[in-house]
A protein has these predicted regions:
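Membrane-penetrating hydrophobic segments
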Residues: 1-12
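P-loop NTPase motor domains
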Residues: 11-21, 26, 40, 44, ...
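Ser/Thr/Pro/Gly-rich low-complexity linker/stalk segments immediately outside membranes or between
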Residues: 27-32
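Short, polar loop/linker segments at the starts of domains and inter-domain junctions
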Residues: 47-48
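Short, solvent-exposed coil/turn elements at secondary-structure transition points
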Residues: 112-114, 344, 369
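Conserved H-loop
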Residues: 340-347
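Conserved P-loop NTPase catalytic core
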Residues: 352-386
């Protein structure tokens, strides 16, 4: 195999602290470890090449294989802004004070129902394209591949609602998208007559003809034709999806520009059965805002700056929010480094895993996956020349 540089699971180049920790804990060879190296369980150490730019790493292993510890070690050794997807808020509670003492501004986008500081994606919509993107995310999450012949009409109505919020929320008791539900329902539980249509018409009829909300509402009427009520029923279902995240929706994210200062943003969300489509919707909205923020940075500043790091522990909980792991080109464009861990590699998740691995400079398998398919899948995906004892690394030119 030709000589190639390779990347190891250390997104944050220059973190001698993690190297020393891993060396003291796991290395029995007695070798001297260079400052820019990281040591793993078998005593092997690999160089980190600082000039390579963003580093995207995937770590795969079962329970109790040390994935979370490695994530936390890398977060604490950060020397640049980072975003941490934080299941149940554990990392926020454990790391926030240490990060503050290290000079970070620590923020939190909290999607946990029992807390109040919930992220409001409406705060960052600025133009028609933002609105359309926002609405399509909301619809796609619920469609789950099914064909919806009312899709165009739904898209126009939901866009009208969003534009209404953007333009008139200062003068109304409407701050979040689901606050529009009263505009599409009557006194009963379901839309069974024209009362709701009358109420909706009253809401938009008083608006100026030049307003975007009025323009999209007219487009909705044209697209829906004789199926206006049926369209409103579907729209109400989509708005109802957001109800589980009830709370105080004052924007407390504190995000201005992750490249202007060292900032650590924790996106906390519930795991297991408490993780709903609404959480996915808010996470996708946040990632849209994050990438838009990075896009707005001028090219010269973007080139000279360190990449923002994204940490995702237990990727399977956020795998459907794959807009930030879809292709390596997206990550390179925005100079975003990704550190993800995955606890299970299952047959029915193969496409999701390949999507994640395809944008990774390196993958490390820590063992411990109970499903025998995991071993077969990894052995088939990685070149056998990339095997270093129990650790499989994907090399890149």
């Amino acid at each position: 195999m030709s000589k190639k540089k390779f990347i190891v699971p250390a997104l944050l180049a220059g973190s001698a602290a993690v190297a020393a920790y891993m060396f003291a804990k796991n290395n029995d060879t007695g070798e001297e470890v260079p400052d820019d190296c990281y040591v793993f369980d078998n005593g092997k150490h690999c160089a980190v090449y600082r000039e390579r730019g963003p580093v995207n790493v995937t770590m795969i292993g079962g329970r109790h294989t040390g994935k979370t510890d490695l994530v936390c070690d890398n977060i604490l050794s950060a020397n640049k802004s980072c975003v941490v997807f934080d299941k149940n808020g554990e990392k926020y509670r454990n790391l926030k004070e240490t990060l503050k003492n290290s000079g970070f501004a620590v923020g939190r986008i909290n999607l946990m129902k029992e807390h109040a500081s919930v992220y409001n994606p409406m705060s960052f919509l600025e133009d028609d394209m933002d609105v359309i993107t926002f609405v399509r995310y909301l619809m796609d999450i619920q469609l789950d591949g099914e064909t919806d012949f009312l899709r165009k009409a739904e898209e126009m109505f939901l866009s009208a609602c969003v534009h209404y919020l953007m333009q008139y929320k200062e003068d109304a008791d409407i701050h979040m998208l689901y606050d529009m539900i009263p505009a599409v329902e009557n006194e009963g539980d379901y839309l069974v007559d024209d009362d709701a249509l009358t109420k909706t018409t009253q809401l938009f009829s008083v608006l100026d003809e030049t307003s975007s909300a009025k323009r999209y509402y007219k487009a909705f009427l044209q697209a829906a034709g004789l199926m206006i009520n049926e369209t409103l029923v579907k729209c109400k279902e989509r708005l109802n999806m957001l109800l589980p995240l009830d709370g105080d929706y004052e924007d407390e994210s504190g995000i201005v520009d992750l490249r202007d200062k060292k900032e650590a943003i924790f996106v906390t969300f519930p795991a297991d059965e408490y993780y709903t489509p609404a959480h996915e919707f808010y996470v996708k909205s946040f990632m849209t805002h994050l990438f838009k923020t990075l896009t707005n940075v001028n090219a010269e500043k973007l080139q000279d700056s360190d990449p923002v790091c994204i940490f995702v522990d237990d990727y399977e909980y956020v795998k459907n929010t794959d807009m930030f792991v879809g292709t390596a080109s997206i990550l390179r464009k925005y100079r975003v480094s990704l550190f993800a861990t995955l606890s299970n590699v299952l047959l029915n998740d193969a496409d999701d895993v390949i999507s994640l691995l395809s944008c990774s400079n390196a993958c490390v398998y820590l063992g411990g996956c109970r499903d025998s398919y995991a071993e077969h899948f990894l052995a088939k995906y990685f070149d056998t020349d990339c095997l270093i004892d129990a650790i499989k690394i994907k090399y890149v030119d």
